Amino acid sequence: MLTIAILGASGHGKVVAEIAELCGYQKIVFFDDSKDKSKCESWKINGDTDKLVSTLEAFDACIVAIGDNKIRMEKIRLLQSNNAKITSLIHPLASVSKYSVIQKGTVIMANAVINPFATIGISCIINTNSTIEHDCLIGNGVHISPNVAIAGEVSIGSETWIGIGSSVKQNIKIGINVMVGLGSVVINDIPDNAKAFGVPAKIKL
């Protein structure tokens, strides 16, 4: 029986759990740092991060299902330092090119498209119905929200969040820790640590 540990028992965690089942995991074991939760729908929560770290050998794989990019990366680094068997999960209805690179800890959701020679970093969220075109470079801990379209040869820095329904023009460079607001159209480069919103997207101070 294939068993996976999922750290993070929120709404995002539920989606990750279903993808894990579709990928062949028969047993889902949740962990969460909230003291107020004992279950995630029908799945029992078996403890917090420390409990997961102390029981890693019991699992065939583990993944972090936390929406906050910074926290997700903190947790993935902790698990890596403890030799966790971190996996990626790809929904069966996603279209992922055999020429793309998907690094560990990343989740690719239903109807997402990853085209040839795109590289997706560690512990990214590529959400429902989003498109990453050819030759894109997506850094570690990035969240690409539902219905986002990233054109070819775009570079997105680590821990950046691209809001739902946004579009990014080809050859654009988006920095580290950037927030792009929902429905935005990015036609110019965005520097590190910026927030950009609108059509076209403009940097907000």
Segments from the language model and where they lie:
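Conserved acidic residues
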Residues: I28, D60, K104, S158
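Hydrophobic, well-structured mid-protein blocks that either form specific transmembrane helices
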Residues: I76-I132
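Glycine-rich hexapeptide-repeat left-handed beta-helix
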Residues: T128, L137-N140, S145-L205
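Redox-cofactor binding/interface segments in oxidoreductases and associated redox assembly factors
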Residues: C62-A65, I108, F197
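Phosphate-bearing ligand-interacting subdomains
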Residues: K37-S95
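Short amphipathic alpha-helical segments
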Residues: A17-A20, E74-L78, I120-G121, P191-D192
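Hydrophobic, well-ordered beta-alpha structural blocks that scaffold small-molecule cofactor pockets
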Residues: M1-C40, N46-T49, V53-S54
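Short loop/helix-cap segments at secondary-structure boundaries that form the rim of catalytic
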Residues: S34-W43, Y99, N188-P191
